[in-house]
Every structure is written in structure tokens, then in C-alpha cells.
């Protein structure tokens, strides 16, 4: 009986260990499912004309559906300051404004949580509104979030950029990429030309510049003249004439020279 009980204990140990691992895995799954990331998108910087309305755009992305627990908070860090001030909060369709004097009676809600939009408007912006604006969104269970930061500049109307900042950034990026591509293509062409010159094994410079003399071509009449005229004082061996007669007549020992016959001059030195 003792032996059987001991065997039962040995068999039960792996079962209990497997059960413990299952519980830990389930708990870890609940923790990771309960807290997920939420992404916030804002422009890096915007320019607003003095005395006009400025819109602070804030979009967010969440895997969870927005509802009564979704909230939006805006805070402000004045230019040159190290601390931030919360001046706006939105939750369950209600707007809660802070007591910060520079924003009194200037803030209005311009977003739509169903469209993942948490933007606000600021009326009659002044130079005191220069600084950094922070957009923070909570949408449980998506609560782990990196807030969006906007650097806002209030300037005179004549100092407003001709193009929006994002357009300027896009143009500069396109120009840099284009120049990089052009330089890469030029370097590739130069590299290929260099390799082609290195692999070429043709004639040398002196050989390529040496003129090539070709012997003049002789016509049948020139051959006949060569037979008639021989250099004076030179030793001449026997000359043999060969005549090809295509007329079909009888053979003759007499050589009749004509324009249609080619004569061969064979000399023996």
C-alpha cells in the first residue's frame, strides 16, 4: 500500500506543476490584454497669426472603442518655463476648463471622440500663448500612452510661412532624397567607366596612332603594263605567260594579248 501511495504522489506532481503554469499563463494574458498602447498624433509645430484663432489638432489611435471612460486633457508649457499647466479637460461630453488666465474664455472643443479626434480651438491668440501644448488621451483599457507635443508660434500676419510647415518639410525631404539619388547614379556611372577602362586590353597609343598603308589595287591593264615595262639593268629570268581562252577555239602557241585576258608574270631571281 505504501508503494502504491508513493507512486500516486509521483504521478500527481507533474499534474500540479502543469496546473500552476496554466494559471500563470492565464494571469499574464489578462495583464497584457488589460493594458495596451494608445498612439497620439499631433503636428510638431504650427504658426498662428496674432489675434486670430488657432486650431490644435490631435488625433489618436486605439484598439478599444471610445465610450464614457474616454477622456482628453490639454496642458500648456509656456515658452522658457519648466512647468506645465492643465487648462482643458473633456470627458463624457462635458468640457472642464482650468483657471489659467491666458486661456479664459478662449478655449472650445473641436474634436470628435467617435472619429478619434481630440482637437481644440483657441480664440484670439496672443504672444503670451507661445509655447508647447500637450495632448493626452485615455481610453481604458488603453491607458499606456505617449502624449502628443505641439510647438506653437504666434507671429505677425506678414511673418506667416508661405507654405505650411509640413509642406516645407516634405519639399526639403524630397529635395534631399532626389540629390542623394542623383549623386548615387553619377558615382555608379563613373565607377563603371573606370572598370571598363581597366579591363580594356587593346592596342597601345603608339600603335593606334601609326598609319596603316595599303597597297594600291591593280587593274588588269596595270598587269599588262607591268609585263611590258621592266626595270633597266635588272636581271630578268624567263617570263611565262598564261592565257585563258574561253572562246572554245583551237589551241595556238601565239599569245594574243587582249583586255579580257589576265597575264601572270612569274620571275625567278
Curated annotation (Swiss-Prot):
Per the UniProt entry, the disulfide pairs are: 58-135
The record's annotation in CDD domains points to: IgV_P0-like (cd05715)
Question: ITIM motif 2: where is this motif?
Answer: 261-266
Q: Which residues lie on this side of the membrane: Cytoplasmic?
A: 184-269
What family does the database annotate?
A: Belongs to the myelin P0 protein family.
Topology of this chain in the membrane: Single-pass type I membrane protein
Q: What is the lineage of its organism?
A: Eukaryota, Metazoa, Chordata, Craniata, Vertebrata
* Keywords linked to the UniProt accession: Disulfide bond, Glycoprotein, Immunoglobulin domain, Membrane, Phosphoprotein, Signal, Transmembrane, Transmembrane helix
GO cellular component annotations of the record:
cell surface; focal adhesion; plasma membrane
**Sites bearing Phosphotyrosine, chain numbering:** 241, 263
**Which domain of life does the UniProt lineage start with?**
Eukaryota
Q: List the source organism.
A: Homo sapiens
Q: Name one GO molecular function term.
A: structural molecule activity
Query: Where can the motif ITIM motif 1 be found?
Result: 239-244
* UniProt-annotated stretches for the region Disordered: 199-238
- Fill in the domain comment: Contains 2 copies of a cytoplasmic motif that is referred to as the immunoreceptor tyrosine-based inhibitor motif (ITIM). This motif is involved in modulation of cellular responses. The phosphorylated ITIM motif can bind the SH2 domain of several SH2-containing phosphatases.
| Tissue/organ expression | Widely expressed with highest levels in heart, placenta, kidney and pancreas. Isoform 3 is relatively abundant in hematopoietic tissues and fetal liver. Isoform 1 and isoform 3 are expressed in CD14- PB monocytes and pre-B cell progenitors. Isoform 3 appears to be the major isoform in CD34- promyelocytic and promonocytic cells. During differentiation in monocytic cells, the expression level of isoform 3 decreases and that of isoform 1 increases. Isoform 1 is prominent in stromal cells and, to a lesser extent, in umbilical vein endothelial cells and erythroid progenitors.
Q: What is this protein called?
A: Myelin protein zero-like protein 1
One GO BP annotation is:
cell surface receptor protein tyrosine kinase signaling pathway
**Where does this polypeptide localize?**
Membrane
Point out the signal peptide segment: 1-35
Bias regions of kind Polar residues — which residues? 202-211
Q: How does it assemble?
A: Interacts with phosphorylated PTPN11/SHP-2.
Glycosylated residues (UniProt):
50, 130
Q: Looking at the keywords, is Signal present?
A: yes
TM helices/strands, residue ranges: 163-183
Q: What does this protein do?
A: Cell surface receptor, which is involved in signal transduction processes. Recruits PTPN11/SHP-2 to the cell membrane and is a putative substrate of PTPN11/SHP-2. Is a major receptor for concanavalin-A (ConA) and is involved in cellular signaling induced by ConA, which probably includes Src family tyrosine-protein kinases. Isoform 3 seems to have a dominant negative role; it blocks tyrosine phosphorylation of MPZL1 induced by ConA. Isoform 1, but not isoform 2 and isoform 3, may be involved in regulation of integrin-mediated cell motility.
For this chain, the Swiss-Prot or TrEMBL PTM comment says: Phosphorylated on tyrosine residues upon stimulation with pervanadate and concanavalin-A (ConA). Phosphorylation at Tyr-241 and Tyr-263 is required for interaction with PTPN11/SHP-2. Dephosphorylated by PTPN11/SHP-2 (in vitro).
Amino acid at each position: 500500500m505504501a508503494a502504491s501511495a508513493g507512486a500516486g504522489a509521483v504521478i500527481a506532481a507533474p499534474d500540479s506543476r502543469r496546473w500552476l503554469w496554466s494559471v500563470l499563463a492565464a494571469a499574464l494574458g489578462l495583464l497584457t490584454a488589460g493594458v495596451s498602447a494608445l498612439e497620439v498624433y499631433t503636428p510638431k509645430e504650427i504658426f498662428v497669426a496674432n489675434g486670430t484663432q488657432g486650431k490644435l489638432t490631435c488625433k489618436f489611435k486605439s484598439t478599444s472603442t471610445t465610450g464614457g471612460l474616454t477622456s482628453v486633457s490639454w496642458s500648456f508649457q509656456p515658452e522658457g518655463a519648466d512647468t506645465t499647466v492643465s487648462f482643458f479637460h473633456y470627458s463624457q461630453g462635458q468640457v472642464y476648463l482650468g483657471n489659467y488666465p491666458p486661456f479664459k474664455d478662449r478655449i472650445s472643443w473641436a474634436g470628435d471622440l467617435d472619429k478619434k479626434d481630440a482637437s481644440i480651438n483657441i480664440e484670439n491668440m496672443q504672444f503670451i500663448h507661445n509655447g508647447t501644448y500637450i495632448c493626452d488621451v485615455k481610453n481604458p483599457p488603453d491607458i499606456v500612452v505617449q502624449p502628443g507635443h505641439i510647438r506653437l508660434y504666434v507671429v505677425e500676419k506678414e511673418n506667416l510661412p508661405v507654405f505650411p510647415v509640413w509642406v516645407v518639410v516634405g519639399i526639403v525631404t524630397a529635395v534631399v532624397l532626389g540629390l542623394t539619388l542623383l549623386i548615387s547614379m553619377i558615382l555608379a556611372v563613373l565607377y563603371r567607366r573606370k572598370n571598363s577602362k581597366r579591363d580594356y586590353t587593346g592596342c597601345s597609343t603608339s600603335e593606334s596612332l601609326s598609319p596603316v598603308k595599303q597597297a594600291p589595287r591593280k587593274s588588269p591593264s596595270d598587269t599588262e603594263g607591268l609585263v611590258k615595262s621592266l626595270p633597266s639593268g635588272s636581271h630578268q629570268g624567263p617570263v611565262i605567260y598564261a592565257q585563258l581562252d574561253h572562246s572554245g577555239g583551237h589551241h595556238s602557241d601565239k599569245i594574243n594579248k587582249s583586255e579580257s585576258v589576265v597575264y601572270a608574270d612569274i620571275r625567278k631571281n
